[in-house]
């Protein structure tokens, strides 16, 4: 009987150890913005079980206009995050040791979308206008652009008035702003869907203006990369975006 109990305990210990070895590694991903097509690949990977196949148990946290991903990461609310490089660099300057471990987006989709009736035909026409701009680090490309143009950003007839833009396109629909920030794959089409014709809009792509920056990089805290187990988790997570998993999101 004693031998049986000893064997049973040994078996239980072995089973427990095996379950620990094969338990999925929990990861929390903080998105840059609210749930939208921009992040389709991450949701497709979750829905189709690609993370699970890599031994990862991933939780995706949506962002928003009042959520700063670097703060979430620094506070331990996420293991990795999506962020634009200007925001990440600004956070690093403030003491948050962010490191870019992958760059899924290779070009910028950021643009300013303006009502044609405002008379804006070129960037120099922004003077005296109200511009909707996203904050929490996303404002830096715009501020850099205005600096290059020599246009003040503190209002007045010779400068631009900055409107802190939320997650919708209401400022241009309600004529609270002459231009708003949009992404080529999202907010621009929200404006169109709201009934404004493309012929009634003027669009300025940051890429065309030479002021674009890298967007949607995957960032982690530098000190966590000292952990070999965490490194392995990040490799498994990021490799999904060089595989067929990334292609599946194209049909979404």
Spans of model-derived segments:
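Conserved small/polar residues in nucleotide/adenosyl-binding loops
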Residues: 241-248
